[in-house]
């Protein structure tokens, strides 16, 4: 059982980006959406908080789901380097970079083949379900050369 709503005032950082009482979870249910090599940890949830703070780690060569939803995210890169897409903007990301994901923006994170990409993600506790892109959405996104290269894993 995850203690992400654990009321202990201190939980020290452990090696490998782990914290005591916090379960290492699958990013999403297999087959629910396309992604590769991603884990999730819910660090803070409940106990009067209206948001959640989660740590995601994208393994080497992996990527999060390309999705959008009504709610916004705030992200801070903690580990490794990679690339992120928000809307039609693609950027290299590195530790301590901040990424703002407005509502209804297509977004995805990708790790390079040789290292993992880890990040904190702050989000509302109550939120809508993500939407996956349709073929028409993908065609619109791929009309931008930088976005097409990113989606093909060629960014950077």
Curated annotation (Swiss-Prot):
Any one Gene Ontology molecular-function term assigned to this protein's record: lyase activity
Domain of life of the native organism: Bacteria
Catalytic activity: S-methyl-1-thio-D-xylulose 5-phosphate + glutathione = S-(methylsulfanyl)glutathione + 1-deoxy-D-xylulose 5-phosphate; S-(methylsulfanyl)glutathione + AH2 = methanethiol + glutathione + A
Name of the protein in question: 1-methylthio-D-xylulose 5-phosphate methylsulfurylase
EC number of the protein: 2.8.4.6
Stored Gene3D superfamilies: Jelly Rolls
Classification via CDD domains: cupin_TM1459-like
Keywords of this entry: Amino-acid biosynthesis, Lyase, Manganese, Metal-binding, Methionine biosynthesis, Transferase
Annotated knockout phenotype: Mutant does not release methanethiol and does not show an increase in 1-deoxy-D-xylulose 5-phosphate formation after 5'-methylthioadenosine (MTA) feeding. Mutant accumulates a mixture of 1-methylthioxylulose 5-phosphate (MTXu-5P) and 1-methylthioribulose 5-phosphate (MTRu-5P). Inactivation of the gene increases ethylene production from MTA-grown cells.
Function: Catalyzes the formation of S-(methylsulfanyl)glutathione and 1-deoxy-D-xylulose 5-phosphate (DXP) from 1-methylthioxylulose 5-phosphate (MTXu-5P). The S-(methylsulfanyl)glutathione is reductively cleaved to relase methanethiol in a second reaction. Involved in the MTA-isoprenoid shunt of the methionine salvage pathway.
Source species of the chain: Rhodospirillum rubrum (strain ATCC 11170 / ATH 1.1.1 / DSM 467 / LMG 4362 / NCIMB 8255 / S1)
Enzyme class: transferase
UniProt record, GO biological process: 1-deoxy-D-xylulose 5-phosphate biosynthetic process; L-methionine salvage from methylthioadenosine
Entry binding sites for Mn(2+): 67, 69, 73, 107
KW Amino-acid biosynthesis (keyword) present: yes
Active site: 121
Pathway noted in the entry: Amino-acid biosynthesis; L-methionine biosynthesis via salvage pathway; Metabolic intermediate biosynthesis; 1-deoxy-D-xylulose 5-phosphate biosynthesis
Start and end residues of each Cupin type-2 domain: 55-122
């Amino acid at each position: 059982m995850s203690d992400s709503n654990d009321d202990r005032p201190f939980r020290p950082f452990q090696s490998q980006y782990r914290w005591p009482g916090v379960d290492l979870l699958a990013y999403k249910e297999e087959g629910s959406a396309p992604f590769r090599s991603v884990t999730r940890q819910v660090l803070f949830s409940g106990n009067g908080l209206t948001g959640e703070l989660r740590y995601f780690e994208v393994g080497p060569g992996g990527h999060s789901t390309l999705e959008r939803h009504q709610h916004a995210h705030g992200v801070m890169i903690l580990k490794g380097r990679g690339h992120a897409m928000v809307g039609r903007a693609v950027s290299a990301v590195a530790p301590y970079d901040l990424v703002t994901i407005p509502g209804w923006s297509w977004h995805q994170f990708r790790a390079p083949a040789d290292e993992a990409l880890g990040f904190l993600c702050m989000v509302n506790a109550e939120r809508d379900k993500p939407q996956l892109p349709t073929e028409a959405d993908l065609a619109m996104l791929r009309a931008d050369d930088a976005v097409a290269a990113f989606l093909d894993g060629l960014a950077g």
